[in-house]
Amino acid sequence: MELDKIIPADGPNINEVEKYINKYQSEVIVIKCGGSVLLDKKLFNQFIEDISVINKIGLSAIVVHGGGKNIKKKLDENNIETRFIKGLRVSDDKTIRYIEEALLDLNLEILNELKSKNTNVCSISPKENNVINIIPESKELGYVGTPKKINKEKILNFIKNKQIPIVVPLGLGDDGRIYNINADVAAGSIAKEIDARRLLLMTDVEGVLDENQKLISEINLNRANEMLKNNIISGGMIPKINTCLDAISNGVRGVVIVDGRKPHSILFELFSDKGAGTLIRK
């Protein structure tokens, strides 16, 4: 394999890449992508290139994408007011239709970009290859769900065929209706079900910061719990850390909160000694 023709010039060092390829050879990596990575054209193109590289060097990955900002844009265009309860978007009959539309449009855009780079990908959504069955979160939230069952067999079949599934964070309820799912939670549930080696949560921040606002490159479960208890981890980072802790407690060997604003952050996280965020493990 001619790595120098596959790894971008501004990517990680080729010697380091070789070492890490062996490490992940028979493992599965789950990558959740959201935030500005999906909106900033330059970051989006680098994300597409990173996923394409993973496929070309023969590693197995699953991508779950968010789309909160795309959803907001779609709702604003249609004059629909967004309400949140405990950080979750209230999704009534009308809202869920636009949420589905925004997420499926984004999914198609990601697929088309990856296919243009000869990447072997497939779409996973309730309309096509559904793999997530949900339980409704609460009556007041409407069509918002939590994963109840993940179709592991279907996902592993795609991986066996050397495809990278691109997952829309939507699932089906027992009522046959489509429900919106928090993308971090969807990625965490899939990672647990398939015993992923790594779960990468791409964000718009550097990683987990200590009390002096300095980046922590690695923490264990106990320290993360302590930081939550002492409010060192706060705000939007709390649900992300809870997803990380849940995944690690259920078989995922390591979860990384990745700074998605860094060039080729996925490649640097997986294939360099330095990484690109905060690694959390037992």
Q: Residue locations for each model-derived region?
A:
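Membrane-helix cytosolic exit motif
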Residues: 253, 266-267
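Charged catalytic cores and adjacent phosphate/nucleic-acid-binding surfaces used
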Residues: 267, 276-278
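Nucleotide/pyrophosphate-binding catalytic subdomain
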Residues: 1-261, 274, 281-282
